[in-house]
Swiss-Prot record:
The gene is der. Pfam families: KH_dom-like, MMR_HSR1. This is GTPase Der. Keywords: GTP-binding, Nucleotide-binding, Repeat, Ribosome biogenesis. Gene3D superfamilies: 3.30.300.20, P-loop containing nucleotide triphosphate hydrolases.
Length: 448
């Protein structure tokens, strides 16, 4: 699983700037629970081949007992509990404060691995400004500048020290795919029906095992079989055994959801028909796309809305989830067990598409036919020339296209090629990556 790094500190020390520096984006997933005045932000970071999850928190005042700061402290404590490592940010220019001491005292009590980041240290490697922060008992303060990137790489290298990155998955043979369980993550906001759907599945299929989570951030893995096919359900709903059923613990963990998506082969994004597509739904969908996972969208409680609401919802899906237009959308009722057969077929089809072998001769022929039908646009006097294609990976399918002047191929033209490949191979429910590589021209000498 991806390691988790939490960023904590008092207000206005540059935590969000560091978060944006690490994630490279500002549209992070937010834990937008009702009543919270300051939320935890979640995003993906990557250092070389090591991927990780970053949590940005509000200004932390551990001893706050009322108002906004009490809620912010509660959120920060949750982030620390979910984290493998904590980056404690202080403001080197403002100097040491009583709040810094309070936070340090709290972090020491948690037993978490903590790195002290002395932020706003532009051009500063050591000196008296850093020395006073040794008083916090957090070890050596690391001089960083979130705004300029100074020292950030070293900081994250130290945070990830001792945490091995997960092994990359290799391509699978057809026999391996038949014998290997399909890992399925059920993702969605709280109360959209995840636990109801899972209970329905586990009630009608043979339950092989049930592995209780070791910590609050571990997803539950439930191996089970349906017919002659094996699956491993990665549950984010937070289920616990209660008699003969599994009861949902009313606690939504963004980290658990992101971990489950990363670990999954296929993600089932569950949306509540009575509430429509929310910002949180769109954020989770965007994360699925970024992770390159096969995805199926299921609209639960479809039976609870009228025809006008259904038309409105379908338009909302087309607009707000347009970037997942390759994903099948199915209407279900988990409670009434309606639409579950087609849902399983869509899940199987999505995984088959994500792992399909695409022969080089067919890819090249399709590429040349597509170019003959519609050439890439010229860039000045230069027109890109695309020569051949081959598969560069699975889950998601990666198609590598070789040619000349490929840097001038537009995103619009890449989408055109993707549509041609999808149509021919009947690929559904999976993202596709197209990589363009310049071909070596043997007639150009190295000296010219």
């Amino acid at each position: 699983m991806k390691p988790v790094i939490a960023i904590v500190g008092r207000p206005n020390v540059g935590k969000s700037t560091l978060f944006n520096r690490l994630t490279g984006r500002r549209d992070a997933i937010v834990a937008d629970f009702a009543g919270l005045t300051r939320d935890r932000h979640y995003g993906d970071g990557k250092l070389d081949n090591h991927e990780f999850i970053v949590i940005d928190t509000g200004g932390f005042e551990p001893d706050s007992t009322s108002g906004i700061y009490k809620e912010m402290a509660k959120q920060t404590r949750q982030a620390v509990a979910e984290a493998d490592a904590v980056v404690f940010v202080v403001d080197v220019r403002a100097g040491l404060s009583a709040q810094d001491h309070d936070i340090a005292r709290y972090l020491r009590a948690t037993g978490k691995r903590v790195l002290l980041a002395a932020n706003k240290a532009e051009g500063m490697k050591d000196g008296p400004q850093l020395a006073e922060f040794y008083e916090l008992g957090m070890g050596e303060p690391l001089a960083v500048s979130s705004a300029h990137g100074q020292g950030v790489r070293s900081l994250i290298e130290m945070a990830l020290e001792g945490i091995e990155p997960p092994e990359p998955e290799e391509g699978y043979s057809e026999e391996e795919l038949r014998n290997r369980p399909t890992r399925l993550a059920v993702a969605g906001r709280p109360n959209v029906g995840k636990s109801t759907l899972i209970n329905t599945w586990l009630g009608e299929e043979r339950l092989v095992a049930f592995d209780l989570p070791g910590t609050t951030r571990d997803a539950i893995h439930v191996p089970f079989e349906r017919g002659d096919k094996k699956y491993e359900l990665i549950d984010t709903a937070g289920l616990r055994r209660k008699g003969k059923v599994f009861e949902s613990i009313e606690k939504f963990s963004v980290v658990k959801t992101l971990q489950a998506i990363s670990d999954a082969n296929v993600v089932l994004l569950l949306i509540d028909a009575t509430e429509g597509v929310s910002d949180q739904d769109a954020h989770i969908a965007g994360y699925v796309l970024d992770a390159g996972r096969a995805v199926v969208i299921a609209i639960n409680k479809w039976d609870a809305i009228d025809s006008y609401q259904r038309e409105t919802l379908q338009r909302s899906i087309e607009q707000r989830l347009a970037f997942l237009k390759f994903a099948p959308v199915l209407m279900i009722s988990a409670k009434k067990r309606q639409g579950l057969g087609p849902l399983w077929k869509a899940i199987d089809d999505a995984w088959a598409s994500a792992t399909r072998k695409l022969p080089t001769p067919q890819l090249t022929r399709l590429l040349l036919e597509a170019v003959e039908y519609q050439q890439p646009k010229r860039a000045g006097a230069v027109r890109p020339k695309l020569r051949y294609a081959h598969q560069g990976g699975q889950n998601p399918p990666i198609i590598v296209i070789h040619g000349n002047a490929v840097e001038h191929v537009t995103e619009v033209y890449k989408r055109y090629l993707e549509a041609r490949f999808r149509e021919h191979f009947k690929l559904v429910g999976t993202p596709m990556r197209i990589e363009l590589r310049a071909s070596h021209n043997p007639f150009v000498s190295k000296d010219s």
